[in-house]
């Protein structure tokens, strides 16, 4: 980011504080999807677990014997550790990285600022986003915008369908919004390097 700083005139920082929705495909692409239950408890892990996670983040179908060679454990030990991480909610899914453009879909980011959302309305918003056929990922944020939504759509009409649905359910609450289209992906990771250095 520092290399680009002289060219950046304005930027916004949004800090994610809670997920609303998190899917691999929008419901318009795959009609049946059950989201994994996430366990909310603190679990311990060590450098071997982190090395296993780093390996899986780069290749989720890598054989456990190959991971075992990389991290200095037996294949049985890797299998046991992955099973434990699943049970403890550290690993919730093994997911492919999808080239949506190759499937003739586009990704849009919808940034919204809501006013006057009480707990009940936030729950309604979460339910709406989880059932919206175009929503891929949505989170509650802190910053200029308090909600960030990624839409996976075939055309701009589907973007407007989702936006109009939000306006219909929250007519007075949407105080500002911005729509961005993803042109090129520079980086996407499920396991940032800061975690692998712990």
PLM features per residue range, with description:
Residues 1-198:
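A compositional/biophysical signature of low hydrophobicity enriched in polar/charged and small residues
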